[in-house]
Amino acid sequence: MKIKSLYALLFCIFTTGCLDGQKQSDHAILIAYTSTEFPELGSSVCYLNERGDTVIPFGKYHYGGSDTIRHIGFVVEPHTPGWTTINNKGEKLFYTFSFDNGPDYVEEGLFRIINDEMLMGFADTLGNVVIQPQFAFVFPFKDGKAEVTYTGAKKAMDDYGEHWTWQS
């Protein structure tokens, strides 16, 4: 595992050195290292840049499935309303809506985000907030449109409460 990680780090160093004069800080790549042999959801994680410098230390976030971060990545923070989305500098951007046991899927280049008040909006895959959180619930984009509502409530679809829908 350590050899594979070393190869991945060397690959990043060589590929980021060939950016045709573009600023490397704009294209920083972070690689995840976990406290477990294999990355496991929720395990302690740190992120190193292509030079091997620690950008995000162990303990700040837990592993959320992003083993490489070019623009944005998803990590887990205890007691937050979803997946935390960070940039390649380790800065928190926003929370991502949880869907199907993970961060929301990208539909038409956008995914759903939530704020501390549990209002929803949309962001793109570069970490730009495209539509500020302002809705009680939003459905993913389809054919250039998304259904949104300012009112309503979650309703369980089964006896276990694992699956739910939104009624407004």
Model regions: which residues?
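Residue-level detector of conserved, function-critical positions
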Residues: 22-168
